[in-house]
């Protein structure tokens, strides 16, 4: 999930893909990437309705006026657990090492760069564009977000290494212009997109993602993720499945990648101990903090946990007392019950010191599918397998 304190990427779909080269990895079994966290002064804050608005824009949904107003005004600024908001991965690009936000809901690798002003670079590790890379002539990129923020720049080809996995000639989108909203989160230096290359936003020719470049060099063309919160480290593994990280048997769901996302269908859902509901189609997205569902499911779950739950115009989303005990939310995938503990749904106070909390689940604003963001994913061991393609789910060990 791209945070930069307030943002998540909005995408445009393209059809053609440019090429990059993988370097054959030894040994071929795979590599592990561990979490990093930069030590920066001050307290990191997060714009909660900004997170929500940006997730909606990312998937082409209409942002309700109340959510937009709350996001722009910054009326719900808070400090949740660090690992509940963003998942950073150390990435070496040329001679520079940056901490990038790991995002399975986008297909761009874009970074803070030496093309920014010195004040914009302050506190960030940046990609030195004059070091080893080669500028891709005529190529550019530009993104905009639900809170009004934006970034754009040039494209370079360079060597990119993540946890020992190396791609040569990888497209790197170097920020040349950036709005002020991006500068607040000093931990985060950019984005590592891991969706399908068909939605890469480089113009005029979309580029391959890092994963699509390197997957042929791995023992298996997959990556596996263990997202965790409350200060525990998370892990990203390329090329192999680590049986020590999950319990039981992996349950697989077919992926529909026609729109460029890791989209799957769960057989049913359940609120608490209630009856099973209908099937749910959604996207597995590490780049979205929240779990976005049909509004009827959201209201049903929150009303069961606290009858006074409300969709607050001032907070820009569903809120409830922080003391409320919320029911678990379960989705069944090929016979496996993936459980989101109720405590995860109680995400964060709407503002520092508030007794009202912002819901970790929010409405999908009628887009017709769900977004299985970090609120869901951090309770699971998840395998993103390009063969099929398919997704594997199991309870974390």
Curated annotation (Swiss-Prot):
<dbReference type="InterPro" id="IPR001461">
    <property type="entry name" value="Aspartic_peptidase_A1"/>
</dbReference>
<dbReference type="InterPro" id="IPR001969">
    <property type="entry name" value="Aspartic_peptidase_AS"/>
</dbReference>
<dbReference type="GO" id="GO:0009268">
    <property type="term" value="P:response to pH"/>
</dbReference>
<keyword id="KW-0865">Zymogen</keyword>
<comment type="function">
    <text>Secreted aspartic endopeptidase that allows assimilation of proteinaceous substrates. The scissile peptide bond is attacked by a nucleophilic water molecule activated by two aspartic residues in the active site. Shows a broad primary substrate specificity. Favors hydrophobic residues at the P1 and P1' positions, but can also activate trypsinogen and hydrolyze the B chain of insulin between positions 'Gly-20' and 'Glu-21'.</text>
</comment>
<dbReference type="Pfam" id="PF00026">
    <property type="entry name" value="Asp"/>
</dbReference>
<dbReference type="InterPro" id="IPR033121">
    <property type="entry name" value="PEPTIDASE_A1"/>
</dbReference>
<keyword id="KW-0325">Glycoprotein</keyword>
<dbReference type="GO" id="GO:0004190">
    <property type="term" value="F:aspartic-type endopeptidase activity"/>
</dbReference>
<keyword id="KW-1015">Disulfide bond</keyword>
<keyword id="KW-0964">Secreted</keyword>
<comment type="similarity">
    <text>Belongs to the peptidase A1 family.</text>
</comment>
<keyword id="KW-0064">Aspartyl protease</keyword>
<feature type="signal peptide">
    <location>
        <begin position="1"/>
        <end position="20"/>
    </location>
</feature>
<dbReference type="GO" id="GO:0005576">
    <property type="term" value="C:extracellular region"/>
</dbReference>
<dbReference type="GO" id="GO:0060359">
    <property type="term" value="P:response to ammonium ion"/>
</dbReference>
<dbReference type="GO" id="GO:0006508">
    <property type="term" value="P:proteolysis"/>
</dbReference>
<keyword id="KW-0378">Hydrolase</keyword>
<dbReference type="InterPro" id="IPR034163">
    <property type="entry name" value="Aspergillopepsin-like_cat_dom"/>
</dbReference>
<dbReference type="InterPro" id="IPR021109">
    <property type="entry name" value="Peptidase_aspartic_dom_sf"/>
</dbReference>
<feature type="propeptide" description="Activation peptide">
    <location>
        <begin position="21"/>
        <end position="71"/>
    </location>
</feature>
<feature type="active site">
    <location>
        <position position="285"/>
    </location>
</feature>
<protein>
    <recommendedName>
        <fullName>Penicillopepsin-1</fullName>
        <ecNumber>3.4.23.20</ecNumber>
    </recommendedName>
</protein>
<comment type="subunit">
    <text>Monomer.</text>
</comment>
<feature type="glycosylation site" description="N-linked (GlcNAc...) asparagine">
    <location>
        <position position="311"/>
    </location>
</feature>
<keyword id="KW-0732">Signal</keyword>
<feature type="domain" description="Peptidase A1">
    <location>
        <begin position="87"/>
        <end position="394"/>
    </location>
</feature>
<feature type="active site">
    <location>
        <position position="103"/>
    </location>
</feature>
<keyword id="KW-0645">Protease</keyword>
<feature type="disulfide bond">
    <location>
        <begin position="322"/>
        <end position="357"/>
    </location>
</feature>
């Amino acid at each position: 999930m791209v945070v930069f304190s307030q943002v998540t990427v909005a995408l445009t779909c393209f059809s053609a893909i440019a090429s990059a080269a993988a370097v054959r990895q030894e040994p071929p079994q795979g590599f592990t990437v561990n979490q990093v966290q930069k030590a920066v002064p001050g307290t990191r804050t997060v714009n909660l309705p900004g997170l929500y608005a940006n997730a909606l824009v990312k998937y082409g949904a209409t942002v309700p006026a109340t959510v937009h107003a709350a996001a722009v005004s910054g009326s719900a600024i808070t400090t949740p657990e660090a690992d509940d908001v963003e998942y950073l991965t150390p990435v070496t690009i040329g001679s520079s090492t940056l901490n990038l936000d790991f995002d399975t809901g986008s297909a761009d690798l874009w970074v803070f760069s030496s093309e920014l002003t010195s004040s914009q670079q302050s506190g960030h590790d940046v990609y030195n564009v004059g070091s080893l890379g080669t500028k891709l002539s005529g190529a550019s990129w530009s993104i905009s977000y639900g809170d009004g923020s934006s970034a754009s720049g040039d494209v370079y080809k360079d060597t990119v290494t993540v946890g020992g996995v190396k791609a040569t000639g990888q497209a790197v989108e170097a920020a040349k212009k950036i709005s002020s909203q991006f500068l607040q989160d000093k931990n985060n230096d950019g984005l590592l997109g891991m969706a399908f290359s068909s939605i890469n936003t480089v113009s005029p020719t979309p580029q391959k993602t890092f994963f699509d470049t390197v997957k042929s060099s791995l023992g298996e063309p997959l990556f596996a993720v263990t997202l965790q919160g409350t200060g525990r480290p998370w892990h990203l593994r390329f090329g192999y499945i680590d049986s020590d990280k999950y319990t039981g048997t992996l349950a697989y769901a077919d992926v529909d990648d026609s729109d460029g996302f890791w989209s799957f269908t769960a057989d049913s859902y359940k609120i608490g101990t209630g009856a099973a509901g209908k099937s749910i189609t959604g996207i597995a997205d590490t780049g979205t903090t929240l779990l976005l569902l049909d509004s009827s499911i959201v209201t049903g779950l929150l009303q069961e946990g606290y009858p006074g739950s409300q969709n607050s115009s001032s907070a820009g989303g569903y809120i409830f007392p922080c003391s409320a005990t919320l029911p678990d939310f379960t989705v069944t995938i090929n016979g496996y019950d993936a459980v989101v503990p109720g405590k995860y749904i109680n995400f964060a106070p709407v503002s520092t010191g508030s007794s009202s909390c912002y819901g970790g689940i929010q409405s999908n604003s009628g887009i017709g599918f769900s977004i299985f963001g970090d609120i869901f994913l951090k309770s699971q061991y998840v395998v993103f397998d390009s063969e099929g393609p398919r997704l594997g789910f199991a309870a974390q060990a």
